[in-house]
């Protein structure tokens, strides 16, 4: 039997997300979440679902940049200073929830990557790319006006 890391490298992102969701050992799920810098397994499961959804849009050449995602990030208090929060209807009531734009997914991805590798170039490359876009395009992607001054994007 090959080591687990070999198996996971052969999985698609969707398969990995579903495999994680079907894992019964919550201690393992919590350990993986902590290893990625996320507070708990529920947040990791929701984040994996969103990232899998976004990956599929990209893989099938779908329009992503100005699209609201069907999946929404879970509330992550640790990242609240960076996330764009909106009032959303949840289970018949109105709650503060992360907005379902690509911006919030990029925030969580940046935090996860930095947690794994402090010297990741993802944040710098994302900033460089985003700064080539117009204010209207940034707004359509859910970027707040002050995005560059938020902690996540400090370089």
Task: Name what the model sees in each region.
Residues 1-155:
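Long, contiguous internal "core" modules enriched in hydrophobic/ aromatic residues
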């Amino acid at each position: 039997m090959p080591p687990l890391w070999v198996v996971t490298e052969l999985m698609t992102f969707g398969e990995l997300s579903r495999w994680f969701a079907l894992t019964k050992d919550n201690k393992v799920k919590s350990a993986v979440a902590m290893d990625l810098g996320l507070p708990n397994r529920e947040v990791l499961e929701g984040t994996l679902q969103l990232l899998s959804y976004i990956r599929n849009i990209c893989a099938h050449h779908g329009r992503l940049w100005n699209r609201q995602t069907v999946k929404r990030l879970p509330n992550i208090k640790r990242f609240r200073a960076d996330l764009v929060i909106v009032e959303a209807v949840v289970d018949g009531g109105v709650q503060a929830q992360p907005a379902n734009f690509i911006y919030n997914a990029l925030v969580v991805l940046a935090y996860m990557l930095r947690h794994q590798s402090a010297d990741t170039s993802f944040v710098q490359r994302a900033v460089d790319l985003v700064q080539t876009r117009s204010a209207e395009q940034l707004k359509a992607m859910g970027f707040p006006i002050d995005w560059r001054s938020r902690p996540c994007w400090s370089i």
